[in-house]
């Protein structure tokens, strides 16, 4: 094992990326700052080579739009991406996990999935616009989870998934694997 270089350590703590090992960290809620940092790190790693990338996740969820940006970046990466979830893969974090080529969970990690929550105010017409947008996002969420679940459980229905998403559904690492939402427990 080579000795850590000071600039590699600084980059790791400042930006959540360790270039020599092609590892990214996702350890805060999904917001604009985390998303921008993650997207830059992934872009740098993708630009340097197509070698595999590992993402270390401990994510409680957050903003859907920033999460979808991360999801799309991982899904379209030219590199094989493995996400290792430690602690949390909750809400938007569980959705992001589905973008990876390989989805791993630590034995004590917890996954939680649900439809997102929004607050809207204003004239009825404006609230309807937000409701329609939330329904669109819910369909995108279903399309991320459902194929993964069906691969593991061919008889699982979209209605069953929708019932799970109507409330907070917590899964252990082993339950996540059994549901098809993770590939294996570390």
Predicted segments with their positions:
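N-terminal organellar transit peptides
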Residues: 1-186
């Amino acid at each position: 094992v080579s000795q850590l270089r000071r600039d590699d350590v600084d980059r790791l703590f400042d930006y959540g990326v360790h270039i020599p090992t092609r590892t990214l960290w996702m350890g805060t809620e999904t917001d604009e700052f985390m998303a921008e940092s993650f997207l830059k790190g992934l872009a740098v790693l993708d630009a340097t080579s197509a070698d595999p990338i590992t993402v270390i996740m401990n994510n409680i969820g957050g903003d859907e739009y920033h999460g979808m940006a991360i999801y799309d970046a991982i899904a379209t990466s030219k590199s094989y991406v493995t996400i290792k979830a430690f602690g949390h893969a909750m809400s938007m974090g569980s959705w992001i996990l589905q973008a990876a080529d390989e989805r791993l969970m630590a034995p004590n990690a917890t996954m939680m999935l649900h439809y997102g929550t929004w607050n809207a105010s204003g004239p009825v017409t404006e609230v309807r616009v937000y409701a329609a947008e939330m329904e669109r996002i819910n369909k995108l969420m279903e399309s991320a989870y459902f194929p993964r679940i069906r691969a593991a459980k061919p008889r699982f229905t979209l209605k069953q998934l929708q019932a799970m998403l109507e409330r907070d559904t917590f899964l252990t690492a082993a339950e996540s694997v059994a549901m098809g939402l993770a590939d294996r427990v570390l």
